[in-house]
Amino acid sequence: KEGYIVNYHTGCKYTCAKLGDNDYCLRECK
């Protein structure tokens, strides 16, 4: 997760949320 700001509430990268790539984001979180 280097180079990304992580949302501590979800553990997801903020950039994922901004791009709307929720499925990809969830995989990255896990």
From Swiss-Prot:
InterPro entries: LCN-type_CS_alpha_beta_dom, Scorpion_toxin-like_sf, Scorpion_toxinL/defensin. Coiled coil: none annotated. It comes from the Eukaryota. The lineage of its organism: Eukaryota, Metazoa, Ecdysozoa, Arthropoda, Chelicerata. Residues 1-30 form the LCN-type CS-alpha/beta domain. Belongs to the long (4 C-C) scorpion toxin superfamily. Sodium channel inhibitor family. Beta subfamily. This is Neurotoxin II.22.5. GO terms for molecular function: sodium channel inhibitor activity; toxin activity. Binds to sodium channels (Nav) and inhibits the inactivation of the activated channels, thereby blocking neuronal transmission. One of its GO terms (cellular component) is extracellular region.
